[in-house]
Each structure stands twice: as C-alpha cells, then as structure tokens.
C-alpha cells in the first residue's frame, strides 16, 4: 500500500515546487521509492513543438527520478494563468476521473507519492462542466497536506487564514514549512516562534537556496499516510 502527502501553499510562487523537490530528494537519497504527481500545470515551456511541464521537470532533475516528467502531470498548459482559465483558453475539459486515474497509475509505481498542488489552496482547477477546486482534488485523493508559507512579513496572517480554510474543509494538515527562512532575520525568527507557540501543527523551515531540508527523514515519513 502506497503512502502519500499533498503539498499546498499560502499563495502562488511561495516555493511549492522547490520544497517538493527537496522532500522527494531527501527520501530517495535513503532509497525510499518516492514519486511525484501534479494534476494541472500552467506556464509550460514549448520546446520543438512539445510542451514541457517545468515544475515536474525541475522535481525530476533535483530528485533524480527517471522517466518523462510530463507523465507525472495530467493537464499541461502553456499560458501562465490559473488552471481553470488555461483550460478555458485551450477548450479543454478537466476531468476528476482522469486525475484520479492518472494518480492511481503513478502511485502504483512508488511506495511514497508526493502530490504538488497549483497556486494556493483556494485555486480553481476547472469551471467547465465539472466545477473543481484544488481542495476537491486533495479530498478525492484522500491525502493529508503540508502547507508551504513564506518566512517573511505577513506570513502569520496568510498562514492562519490558509489553515482555517483547510480545517473548515476537513483537510488534515501535517506540518507548516516556512520557506526562504533566514536564521538571522528577526522577522523570520518571530514568525516561526509565534506559529509554533500558537498552533498545534509542527513548524519547520527551509533556508533560501538550500539543497537540503532541515527535517529528519524519519519525521518526513510520518507525514505520509496510506492511500
């Protein structure tokens, strides 16, 4: 039985892909068979008439996953917009059945699977025949979540609002990770202290441009649940 976790964030460009790659890399370095999946990706680069799923490509390179990164993404769009708008612009109907089928195929190849979301937790994936929000994907795949937040000014507000929304939607939250953390920045230090003292969820950090996570492998494994 595979185990999985979902990576979401307090907003766009917080560092989900960067952290996801480091998580998978850390697990694979100790011979844990960990893979990657993403339901919808926008902003893909076109090379020789082929769209390249940039986030997946980055994760595959950093974590040393073999195979075609595009196979880890159900829907790939060139426009750098929200998935629901990209789908509309390309006349594509996003299907939850396809997402669940693709995820099932991916998880059968690995013992651990790390799923990356799009944007923040409140992200429209499809507004076509099926109305799909990112939260619907998390719940359909029956995954707990890790929340990535920026370490800087404003993160207390953004993080707590994100957590409140997720709890209202009954999405289990395993940890918060403050990205771009600087151990000498008084704002970063205070943000971590406040969140750690006022939440019942573990708070970890990831320094900017780090090639490793300051989280023991044994602890990381605990965040994954059977799926």
From Swiss-Prot:
Catalytic activity: (7R,8S)-7,8-diammoniononanoate + CO2 + ATP = (4R,5S)-dethiobiotin + ADP + phosphate + 3 H(+)
Keyword match Transmembrane helix: no
Superkingdom in the source lineage: Bacteria
Subcellular location per the Swiss-Prot or TrEMBL entry: Cytoplasm
Alphabetical list of Pfam families matching this protein: AAA_26 (PF13500)
Molecular function per GO: ATP binding; dethiobiotin synthase activity; magnesium ion binding
Chief site of localization: cytoplasm
Pathway participation: Cofactor biosynthesis; biotin biosynthesis; biotin from 7,8-diaminononanoate: step 1/2
Active site: 38
Keywords, alphabetical: ATP-binding, Biotin biosynthesis, Cytoplasm, Ligase, Magnesium, Metal-binding, Nucleotide-binding
E.C. number: 6.3.3.3
Annotated positions binding ATP: 13-18, 55, 116-119, 179-180
BP-aspect Gene Ontology terms: biotin biosynthetic process
Annotated substrate binding sites: 42
Entry's Gene Ontology cellular component terms: cytosol
Cited CDD domains: DTBS
Binding, Mg(2+): 17, 55, 116
Disulfide bonding pattern of the chain: none
Required cofactor names: Mg(2+)
Family matches, as InterPro entries: DTB_synth_BioD, P-loop_NTPase
Free-text function comment from the UniProt entry: Catalyzes a mechanistically unusual reaction, the ATP-dependent insertion of CO2 between the N7 and N8 nitrogen atoms of 7,8-diaminopelargonic acid (DAPA, also called 7,8-diammoniononanoate) to form a ureido ring.
HAMAP family associated with the record: BioD
Assigned protein family: Belongs to the dethiobiotin synthetase family.
Quaternary state and interactors: Homodimer.
Protein name, as recorded: ATP-dependent dethiobiotin synthetase BioD
Species this protein is from: Clostridium botulinum (strain Loch Maree / Type A3)
Protein's gene: bioD
